[in-house]
Swiss-Prot record:
Protein name: Glycine cleavage system H protein, mitochondrial
Compartments in which it is found: Mitochondrion
Needed co-factor(s): (R)-lipoate
Lineage: Eukaryota, Metazoa, Chordata, Craniata, Vertebrata
Transit peptide limits: 1-45
Name of encoding gene: Gcsh
Length: 170
């Protein structure tokens, strides 16, 4: 037991570079070839951005996934029908592309970015309530190519959107 404690203390001291003597080799340490670097940049992160009309978008590899925010789905109530565009539809930023109908109201959908629709969430035809149950995951609406990825910079971050929602609730 004491030998194990000594090895642990020595390993900690070496990892903190406190040891006076040279550190013994660590067989559990990854080799230089096995170490992977993690880069973080706006092109690599899939961050959710929001519009003032309560749509959200995440972008990865030039494809944007679009849906409505939790605030919007709560305001709508139980979604019973989704009217979505066809694949191949070209959209401009803030252009109307469909509508959601609920037991309380109907709400138009607006494209957060410019691009072309590449996929429509077919599951919503059978189960439009996915928008309520999982608005950020299974309840997404469309996927689209981004014709101008710089438009993402004009949208609100999650924190800014939360502040925006609080300001309109007051």
């Amino acid at each position: 037991m004491s030998l194990r404690v000594v090895r642990s203390v020595r390993a900690v001291a070496c990892s903190l570079r406190i040891a006076l003597a040279s550190c013994p080799p660590r067989p559990w340490a990854p080799s230089a070839a096995a170490v992977r670097s993690l880069r973080t940049g706006s092109a690599l992160l899939s961050v959710r951005k929001f519009t003032e009309k309560h749509e959200w978008v995440t972008a990865k590899d030039g494809i944007g996934t679009v849906g409505i925010s939790n605030f919007a789905q709560e305001a709508l109530g139980d979604v019973v029908y989704c009217s979505l565009p066809e694949v191949g539809t070209k959209l401009k930023k803030q252009e109307e592309f469909g509508a959601l109908e609920s037991v309380k109201a109907a709400s138009e959908l607006y494209s957060p970015l410019s691009g072309e629709v590449t996929e429509v969430n077919e599951a919503l035809a059978e189960n439009p309530g996915l928008v309520n149950k999982s608005c950020y995951e299974d309840g997404w609406l469309i996927k689209m190519t981004l014709s101008d990825p710089s438009e993402l910079d004009e949208l609100m971050s999650e924190e800014a959107y939360e502040k925006y929602v609080k300001s309109i609730e007051e």
